[in-house]
Structure formats: structure tokens, C-alpha cells
């Protein structure tokens, strides 16, 4: 074994780019909070706090109570996240998805539910095996500790792959994963050992990963450690690894596949699939480093027979083809119905083409890439064999004469087109200028500049005939080119627009205007024309990936037509059931939380078809009826949530080496046992005998499934909607009774870090371990909650986590000190400071509950954390200004409520406060959500009044000083002692009466709703002639109504609180916060020159300040003077 000291410096220094993440300056407060977190994590583990079981069959016999009745007595919650793949450490993006289940589980516990959050580890498929095999080669190249690796070979941050050119038609229902994620994860590292080193694995240990099984032993414990440090409420008894490394899970997957086969959901036959020639097998989504979600695109490939070679082509091919060979240029088209209008055939002048043997005496002129696809689709004579007779450049082909099948022009010429791509189709394009704006523009260009392009003018002047008639034109492409003022093939933006318009109108509204199907709709004629061409031997089916796909082994993939086992997703009856379930019209389907998520699912259901479910390379469970194949990774991961329910009955360790509480051997888990557990069949004596499992044990496992199923929520990134999440739903519908289908799914956007995409190559990247070590678990969890909800991308902001450390530490210190404070008030609560604070806490508890129930965690955090702290601080300031201590009962109530409402998000801090500050005997993880009275609308209105009035006073002073600067005021000096006069009124201006009457007419007090829509209401207001001042007035009244203030008070033009008493109570606080020497409150009436000084017993005084007239009930006006 090599001395580690001798390892090349290049390896030792290998790292991701310098970190762009925030640098912390002091860690004492953080370290204190982390010490608390570690203490409570240990307690939770020792006490088995998160181990959750269904009610036993001893307490409730299986046949004595239905699952629904049992859940009524003992409510449950069951949530899962897509299990992570075990080829690396969890990163902050994983944590974001985990956090959603975490918060949900924590809140469910507080609702009194038995909340189950289990976790497994996905190891199936190509990635681990491919990485291990790469490592074997690298060890051969560089030595066991890579000591022969040279420093100048280090690739510190290869640039991400260039973005693909935009597609002409983008299917907005498809979510395609951006494989910049690969660069983000690897940091652009060139070799597998570099990737592993970037994960913090010592160089001396990396060689162990050449054994794929070692990955299964290394990464799952790391995953568990990271999630435990995060404070996850996971029942770790139920953890497992996939593949045949765990014989129990292996038995489960065999059952799943057997039953799908019996249901005729799995079939065998030839189908197009993305294929890696290098790997020798299909390349499914999880096997790809680029191109996740990409599907085969099927074309019609035409056979344009060469009738006369251009001189240069004849010279280039001289002696390379058999005498009398039939040679065809083979353009691939998506619009076979337009072939009647072919006027030429385009090639890229600079592109390299090959002349490939397709059959005896038959050759195709196409690109090398197209040949690779055709070789595996039964098009060439020998399967998988590419025989190239000659190479030729596109410029040599120009002027070649070819036969154009179906075209009104029997023979057409090969002409140049610079925009032909070698990476799309066959590199040969047939031209139909009647219906293709691109072709029309190019033909016009060629006819204008024949000498420039090296052609004869007449080659580009063949007559354009009408092939398709549309409502707009019989020659749609020329019409659009003229209308959009397209003057050149380089007018890309206009051409893209024209192409979209031409395709949509031609296909959906077009009528065939030429050929055997004249008069038929294009939609119905298209497949007929295609079949006619194929039957005549003038065309054949050809397929290729719709975009670039690269396997994890580095192979650019092709499409193969091959015999294989596939799951028949998209089969009509199956698809219809799923579509209806997702559409959820009757409210009994699946809840997707957001319309965008539902729309994405419906789109995928529309296009998703057969899916290859087996492969020959990688890790996994063997196909039961054909053990030469392995079940692929997106097919063994669709219903494993059901496995969670009984995993702890089967085994005690990840690999199933130690039997679980049921004392069952893996060989006893025959298909019939799974059928019984999952409520597909009833129990028989024969099954008990055959399996050797006692009836009591079988019943107990069935109880676990019956109780926890269906799954209440599944959380995953939105990029799994096109595959895993849709497969998950399809399989549940096929395998389980209706009452066990999933209830909800939440798709998240991707997580940004500090407003930028996470990427190792830029240094803007953090693992979950990094985040928790840097900020602690609770601060990280707060920042994840603050990052956002919904399907759009969210943003983890490190400043939020950093500031949370200070908030939690400071609040902890305040709580500890305040609980010891013997000067706190006792006795009755007062009607102002105490009453407002008490009411606000009640309101925030109920608001937080609502947001938790709606899984709106950013809003829940605002109510439960930020607003709770603000309410406390406002109470402290109000009491200090009034010269009174805080009330002991309210302080204790605040501390209890603050700990409880933040528990789902920040459980460590909450449990510390609960047990060590409040002295509660049991963990807060067992506490219930607090029951508090509904908020008093009058007190809520008074609280809002205090806040808005305080803010308005600050604004009023600034406005008055601004006027003074313009010469309008000269008698107020803000540097001298200040006096504030507050003008209040009890009556609304008379002009407002008619709008009050209007609102009374359209507001339904019984239901708390508006009888007419806003558009009609605004129209009626506009007709009354005072829109500018009336609209804000009506909107303010509507807001108060919607906020719950009694309608009779608002519509009778009364405030729900005593404004005069509130203003007088505010005076001490205003003096302190606004630096006032004196505050005077004057009650005024409309049109009067006098008012009542409420601060002087109601004495009548003269009112001269003009802003006195601006006062409204609930909206006082202000005037500053000097004392």
C-alpha cells in the first residue's frame, strides 16, 4: 500500500472552488444552541420519541373495528419524501424537501396524531455500479491512492455544458431536469476519485468504493447521521436499503413485479427506448448525467433516391460503391403529409456525411449520429453493425438530383442550407416551402443569390403548390413570411414565430388540398400519408432522442428498437383512472396543493407511454420470471411507502441480516403474504401453513398497513413529476384497493443559495452537514421554512440562519432572566397593554395553526416566530412607557405559547424552553397544539390602530418638516422640546354616508361575503362621482369587514373599540418613542372651530390647525409645535 505522504500534491489540493458562502465572525451563541440540540437529539433517541406503531391487534382485534373507525379513535399521519440516492451526501436541496415533511410531522404530532415519518435509501440502478467501475479503471491508471496522478491534470471547475438551443415547440407540461445539477454536485471534477474526495472522503479510503457494495455500507449511515443532526422526526426502525442486498425488500419488489405482470401492466415487445451503446442497455432517467426526462422522438425518414450525382459527389464516391447500387438521401420529417410539396433537398455544406450500407445494394446518405440510431432500430441489415462505404461533405452533394416520393416534382435538386444541424434528424432536410416558413425563406434567398451559393438559379425556382388549405391561406408559409416581413433565413425571431403559427394552424385547422386524401383534415390524413409512404417502400420509421442524452458512463445515447420488458403506462383505461384522480373534480382524488403541480401531472399523464422496467447492468432486484434482467431504479421505487409500514416487523438492520419483531425469514415473505398484508386477499389456513408465519403476526402486519395507509403526503422536487411521482400514482392505482391510494403530493421548486443556483463549481454549495455545522439545526430549519413554499424555486438565505441564532439565543436569555424576575406584576390584567398582548397572542396562535394546516410554512414561521417576537417586544415597550412591570401570567403564557407554536419548525429550542425553563416533565414533542380563545376583533382593531397611529405620527412629523423646508411652516423647530396635538373625531364626514349605505346594501353580514363582484361595485361607485376619495374609503371598510370586525359596528359608522380611551392610553408610550414633551388629544367635529381637549377633562378649546379637518374615525390627524 502506498505511503499517503507520497500522494500527488494535485490530489491533496483538489477541492471545489473557493466557497462563496457566508463567513461567520463569532460562534459562541451558535455553539451554545448546538450543545442544546445535541442534548435533545440524544434524549429523543434514547426515549424512542419518534418510534410510532399502529394500535395493536390485542387492543383492537383486526376484525372488530374498521380502519376508518380505528383512525377516528386514534388519528394518524403518514408522510414520506422520495428516498435519496446513496452515491453522495445530502445537500441543502435535499434538506429543503425533508423540511416540508418535518414540519408537517411535527404539527401532526401536536394535533394528537400518531405521526409516522420513515426513511429508506435508494441504491438501485446504474449510478453506483458505473461509478465503482470508473474507480476500478482509475486505480489501474493512478494507483490505489492515486499517487501517479499528476497535478496538472486537476480539473478544478470545468465549465458547465452549454445550454441547448431552444426548441421550436416547447411542451410546457413537461418538467425537464436541468443537468447542470451534475456539475453542481461534482464541481466539474474529471475523475470519480476527485468527486469522492470532494465529499470529504480521505484519499486512503477511496479505493474501497471500487466495490459497489461498499457504497451501500458507507453512505446510508452518513445520511442517517445528517438527518439526526438536523433533528428529523424519523422512525429509524423502518430504514432499509434497496436492491437484493436486503432480501426482504427484494421479496417485496418481486411481489410488485409479479402482480403487475399478472395484471397485464408489464408487457414484452419491441419498443423505442433511449439506449447506451457503451453500456449495452436502456438508459433510463436515473442513469443519465444529462437529458433527464428526454424521450424518443419518432420521425418519418424518406428515401430520396439519387438519380444523378453532382460532379463533386461522383468524384468523391468513385470506386467506393458497388456498380448499380441504390443510394438514398434520407431526410427525417415530422410532417409527412406535406411531402406532395417537396421542391428540393437541403444539406449542410460544412457537415460531414457518410454513405452507410442499409441492405444489399442499398445505401443511405446520413450523418454518423443518425447511423448509430438506425443500427439499433432494425433499419440496417445487421443489427448493431454500422458499415460505412464512404465519407462525403455536404458541399459536394449540392446539385445532386434525387427522386422525391409523392412530390408534384418528380425530381428535385440537393441545395445548401447553413442551418441544417448534425445533431438533429439525419442531417438531411426535405424542403416544402408551401408549409414551412424556414424553407420558404431559404428558397427565396437561394433564388436571389444563386452565384453566392454555387447553384443554378432554376434549381431553386420550382413551382410552390398548395398542399394544405387553412382559414388564413392556401399557401400559409409564404403568407406568414410576407406578413412578418421575413427578408432572410437569418431573421430567426420572426421565423420561430412563423413556424409556430404555421404548425398549429396547419395541423389543427388544415384541410388537405392535394393528393389521395384531398378534402380530409390534416389530423386524420397525416398518419395515412405516412403509412402510404412506408407501404410503398419510400419511407421508414426512424427515432432518436428528442434532445441530447448522456449516460452516467459518459456515453451519448441513441434510440434502439428492442425487445424488452416494459410497464404499459399510458394504456387507455389505466390512464383515464389516473387522470380523473389527479383532476380531483369530486374532491376525492389527490390533493396537489398548487394548480401548477396539478397541471404538470396532467401534462405528463397525457404524453407518458411505455417504460422499460428492466436492465442487465447495475444494482437491483432480479426480474422474477427472467433473472437475466434487473428491475430498474424507477420501477422498484414506486410503492415502497407500503414497505415502510411493516419494515420493522421484518428486520432490525438496513440489510435484513437480523430478523425484526415478527421473527420472519425473508424466504417466508412469499407473494401471497404481501397480498394479505396489503389487503388484496383474505387470510386462509393454507397461507399460514405455506408461509410458516403465525396468524397473529400476519394480522399485526396487516394492521400496520391498514392503519397508516393511505399515505397522507409525499414530498419531492418538481423534477420528479415526469417520472417517479407519476409512476408512483400509476402503481398505487394498479396494486392497491381504492381506499389506499395516496391522499396528497407536494412538489417543491429547486433551492437556491443566497439568491444564486447551488453549484460546487462556483463555490455556492452547501451539504446538509455543512449547514447544520455552520448554523445549528434550528437556525437551518428556520431558514428553510423562510426559503419559500410552492413549485417555484425557493431561496435559502444564510443571513436568515445567522440572524436566527441571535434571535433564539437572545430570547432564551430573556426567558431565563424574566422567569426569575420577582418584580413582575400579578393580579388582574389591565385593559390596555395586557389585554392587547393577550389578544394578539391568541390571534397569532390561531393564525399559525391555519398556515401549518395549509402547509404554508413561510407564513407559519412569520406568525409563530417573527410576529410572536414582535408582539412581545411591543408589549415590553408599552409597559415600560407606562412605567409598569410586565404581567407574570402573560409572560408565562408567552413563553409557553412561543415554545409550542415554533415546535414544528425549531423543536430543539422549543424543547429546551419547555423542559428546562418551564420545568415540564415530558418532551414538547408529546405536547398538543395550544387551545386559545378566538381573537377579539375589537382588541385586534385597537392593536392595529396603535401600530398604524404610531407609524402615522412619525410620518406626520416628517411631512410637516418637509412643508417647513418649502417655506409653508416656520413655527416648529424639531430640535426644541416638542408637543404633539392629535385630532380625533367620532363622526364620519357627511359625504361618506352614501357609500356606507351602498356597502350596507351589497354586504351579506350573515355570511361575511359581498353579494356582488368588485367590478360591479366599482362601477356603482364610479357613477356616484367621487371615485378618487371614495374608493380608498370603501376599500378600507371592506378590509375591516373581512378581518372580522362586526358588520353592524362598521356599517353603522362606529369603531369596534374606544378610540378616545386608546389614544389616552397611548400617550406615555408616544412620549417615550417619539421624544415628546407633551401630547394633547383633541376631539373635533366637522365644520366646527372648537374642540374638546380630552387630556384636560374635555375642556373646550379653539382649533386653528388646518389638518384638524382631515381627522376621521379611526384615522386621527396630527400637528407638531414646540412647548
Swiss-Prot record:
Report the main location listed first in the record. cytoplasm
> Which Pfam family is an annotated match for this chain, by its short name?
Anticodon_1
All disulfide bonds of the chain are none
Signal peptide region: none
| Motif placement: 'HIGH' region | 84-94
Q: Does the keyword Kinase apply?
A: no
GO cellular component labels: cytoplasm
Q: Which of UniProt's keywords are assigned here? A: Aminoacyl-tRNA synthetase, ATP-binding, Cytoplasm, Ligase, Nucleotide-binding, Protein biosynthesis
What's this protein's name? Leucine--tRNA ligase, cytoplasmic
Gene this chain is encoded by: leu-6
Amino acid at each position: 500500500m502506498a505511503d499517503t505522504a507520497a500522494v500527488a500534491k494535485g490530489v491533496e489540493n483538489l477541492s471545489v472552488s473557493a466557497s462563496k458562502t457566508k463567513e461567520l465572525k463569532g460562534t459562541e451563541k451558535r455553539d451554545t444552541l448546538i450543545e442544546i440540540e445535541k442534548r435533545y437529539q440524544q434524549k429523543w433517541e434514547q426515549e424512542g420519541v419518534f418510534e410510532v406503531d399502529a394500535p395493536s391487534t390485542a387492543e383492537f382485534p383486526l376484525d372488530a373495528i374498521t380502519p376508518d373507525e380505528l383512525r377516528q379513535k386514534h388519528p394518524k399521519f403518514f408522510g414520506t419524501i422520495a428516498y435519496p440516492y446513496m452515491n453522495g451526501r445530502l445537500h441543502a436541496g435535499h434538506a429543503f424537501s425533508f423540511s416540508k415533511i418535518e414540519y408537517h410531522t411535527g404539527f401532526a404530532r401536536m394535533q394528537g396524531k400518531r405521526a409516522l415519518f420513515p426513511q429508506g435509501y435508494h441504491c438501485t440502478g446504474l449510478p453506483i455500479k458505473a461509478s465503482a467501475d470508473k474507480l476500478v479503471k482509475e486505480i489501474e491508471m493512478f494507483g490505489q491512492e492515486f499517487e501517479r496522478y499528476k497535478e496538472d491534470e486537476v480539473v478544478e471547475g470545468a465549465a458547465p455544458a452549454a445550454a441547448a438551443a431552444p426548441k421550436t415547440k416547447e411542451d410546457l407540461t413537461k418538467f425537464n431536469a436541468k443537468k447542470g445539477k451534475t456539475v453542481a454536485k461534482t464541481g466539474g471534477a474529471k475523475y470519480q476519485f476527485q468527486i469522492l474526495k470532494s465529499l470529504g472522503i480521505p484519499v486512503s479510503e477511496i479505493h474501497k468504493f471500487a466495490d459497489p457494495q461498499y457504497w451501500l455500507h458507507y453512505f446510508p449511515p452518513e445520511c442517517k447521521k445528517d438527518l439526526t443532526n438536523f433533528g428529523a422526526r424519523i422512525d429509524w426502525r423502518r430504514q432499509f436499503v434497496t436492491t437484493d442486498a436486503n432480501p426482504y425488500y427484494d421479496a417485496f419488489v418481486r411481489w410488485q413485479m409479479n402482480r403487475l405482470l399478472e395484471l397485464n401492466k408489464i408487457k414484452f415487445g419491441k419498443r423505442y427506448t433511449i439506449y447506451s451503446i457503451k453500456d449495452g442497455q436502456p438508459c433510463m432517467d436515473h442513469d443519465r448525467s444529462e437529458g433527464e426526462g428526454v424521450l424518443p422522438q419518432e420521425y418519418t425518414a424518406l428515401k430520396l433516391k439519387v438519380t444523378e450525382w453532382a460532379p463533386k459527389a461522383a468524384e468523391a464516391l468513385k470506386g467506393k460503391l458497388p456498380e448499380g447500387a441504390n443510394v438514398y438521401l434520407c431526410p427525417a420529417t415530422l410532417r409527412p403529409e406535406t411531402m406532395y410539396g417537396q421542391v428540393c433537398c437541403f444539406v449542410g455544406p460544412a457537415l460531414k456525411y457518410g454513405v452507410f450500407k442499409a441492405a444489399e445494394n442499398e445505401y443511405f446518405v446520413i450523418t454518423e449520429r443518425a447511423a448509430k440510431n438506425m443500427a439499433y432500430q432494425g433499419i440496417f441489415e445487421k443489427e448493431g453493425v454500422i458499415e460505412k462505404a464512404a465519407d462525403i461533405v455536404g458541399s459536394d452533394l449540392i446539385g445532386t438530383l434525387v427522386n422525391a416520393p409523392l412530390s408534384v416534382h418528380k425530381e428535385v435538386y440537393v441545395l445548401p442550407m447553413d442551418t441544417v444541424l448534425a445533431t438533429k434528424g439525419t442531417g438531411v432536410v426535405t424542403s416544402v416551402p408551401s408549409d414551412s416558413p424556414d424553407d420558404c425563406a431559404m428558397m427565396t434567398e437561394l433564388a436571389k443569390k444563386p452565384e453566392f451559393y454555387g447553384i443554378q438559379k432554376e434549381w431553386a425556382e420550382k413551382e410552390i403548390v398548395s398542399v394544405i388549405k387553412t382559414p388564413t391561406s392556401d399557401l400559409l408559409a409564404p403568407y406568414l413570411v410576407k406578413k412578418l416581413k421575413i427578408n432572410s433565413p437569418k431573421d430567426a425571431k420572426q421565423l420561430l414565430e412563423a413556424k409556430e403559427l404555421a404548425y398549429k394552424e396547419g395541423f389543427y385547422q388544415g384541410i388537405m388540398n392535394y393528393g389521395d386524401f384531398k378534402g380530409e383534415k390534416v389530423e386524420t390524413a397525416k398518419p395515412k400519408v405516412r403509412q402510404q409512404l412506408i407501404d410503398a417502400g419510400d419511407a421508414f420509421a426512424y427515432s432518436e432522442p428528442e434532445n441530447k442524452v448522456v449516460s452516467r458512463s459518459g456515453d451519448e445515447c441513441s434510440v434502439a428498437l428492442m425487445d424488452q420488458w416494459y410497464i404499459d403506462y399510458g394504456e387507455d383505461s389505466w390512464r383515464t383512472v389516473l387522470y380523473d384522480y389527479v383532476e380531483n373534480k369530486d374532491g376525492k382524488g389527490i390533493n396537489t396543493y398548487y394548480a401548477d403541480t396539478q397541471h404538470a401531472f396532467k401534462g405528463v399523464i397525457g404524453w407518458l407511454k411505455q417504460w422499460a422496467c428492466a436492465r442487465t447492468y447495475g444494482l437491483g432486484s432480479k426480474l422474477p420470471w427472467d433473472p437475466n434482467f434487473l428491475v430498474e431504479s424507477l420501477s422498484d421505487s414506486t410503492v415502497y411507502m407500503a414497505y415502510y409500514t411493516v419494515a420493522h416487523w421484518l428486520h432490525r438492520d438496513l440489510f435484513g441480516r437480523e430478523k425484526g419483531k415478527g421473527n420472519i425469514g425473508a424466504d417466508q415473505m412469499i407473494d401471497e403474504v404481501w397480498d394479505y398484508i396489503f389487503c388484496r386477499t383474505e387470510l386462509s389456513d393454507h397461507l399460514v401453513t405455506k408461509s410458516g408465519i403465525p396468524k397473529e403476526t400476519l394480522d399485526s402486519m396487516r394492521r400496520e398497513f391498514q392503519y397508516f395507509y393511505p399515505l397522507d403526503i409525499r414530498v419531492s422536487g418538481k423534477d420528479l413529476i415526469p417520472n417517479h411521482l407519476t409512476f408512483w400514482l400509476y402503481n398505487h392505482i394498479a396494486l392497491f384497493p381504492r381506499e389506499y391510494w395516496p391522499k396528497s403530493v407536494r412538489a417543491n421548486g429547486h433551492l437556491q443559495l443566497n439568491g444564486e443556483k447551488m453549484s460546487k463549481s462556483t463555490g455556492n454549495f452547501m451539504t446538509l452537514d455543512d449547514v447544520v455545522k455552520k448554523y445549528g439545526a434550528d437556525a437551518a430549519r428556520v431558514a428553510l421554512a423562510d426559503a419559500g413554499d410552492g413549485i417555484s424555486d425557493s431561496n435559502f438565505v444564510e443571513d436568515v440562519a445567522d440572524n436566527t441564532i441571535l434571535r433564539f439565543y437572545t430570547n432564551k436569555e430573556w426567558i431565563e432572566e424574566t422567569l426569575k424576575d420577582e418584580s413582575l406584576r400579578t393580579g388582574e390584567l389591565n385593559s390596555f397593554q395586557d389585554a392587547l398582548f393577550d389578544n394578539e397572542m391568541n390571534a397569532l396562535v390561531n393564525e399559525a395553526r391555519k398556515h401549518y394546516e395549509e402547509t404554508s410554512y413561510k407564513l407559519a414561521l412569520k406568525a409563530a416566530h417573527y410576529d410572536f417576537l414582535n408582539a412581545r417586544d411591543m408589549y415590553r415597550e408599552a409597559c415600560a412607557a407606562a412605567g409598569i412591570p410586565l404581567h407574570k401570567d402573560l409572560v408565562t403564557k408567552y413563553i409557553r405559547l412561543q415554545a409550542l407554536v415554533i415546535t414544528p419548525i425549531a423543536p430543539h429550542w422549543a424543547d429546551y424552553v419547555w423542559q428546562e425553563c418551564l420545568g415540564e416533565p415530558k418532551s414538547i414533542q408529546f405536547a398538543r397544539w395550544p387551545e386559545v380563545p378566538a381573537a377579539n376583533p375589537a382588541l385586534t382593531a385597537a392593536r392595529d390602530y396603535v401600530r398604524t397611529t404610531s407609524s402615522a405620527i412619525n410620518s406626520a412629523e416628517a411631512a410637516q418638516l418637509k412643508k417647513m423646508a418649502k417655506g409653508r411652516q416656520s413655527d416648529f423647530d424639531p430640535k426644541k422640546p416638542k408637543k404633539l396635538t392629535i385630532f380625533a373625531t367620532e363622526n364620519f364626514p357627511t359625504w361618506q354616508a352614501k357609500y356606507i349605505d351602498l356597502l350596507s346594501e351589497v354586504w351579506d353580514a350573515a355570511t361575511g361575503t359581498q353579494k356582488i363582484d368588485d367590478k360591479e361595485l366599482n362601477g356603482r361607485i364610479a357613477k356616484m362621482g367621487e371615485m378618487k376619495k371614495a374608493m380608498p374609503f370603501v376599500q378600507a371598510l371592506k378590509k375591516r369587514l373581512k378581518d372580522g370586525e362586526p358588520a353592524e359596528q362598521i356599517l353603522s359608522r362606529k369603531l369596534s373599540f374606544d378610540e378616545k380611551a386608546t389614544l389616552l392610553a397611548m400617550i406615555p408610550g408616544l412620549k417615550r418613542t417619539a421624544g415628546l414633551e407633551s401630547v394633547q388629544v383633541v376631539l373635533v367635529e366637522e365644520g366646527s372651530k372648537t374642540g374638546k381637549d380630552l387630556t384636560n377633562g374635555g375642556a373646550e378649546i379653539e382649533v386653528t390647525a388646518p389638518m384638524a379637518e382631515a381627522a376621521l374615525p379611526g384615522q386621527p390627524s396630527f400637528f407638531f409645535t414646540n412647548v
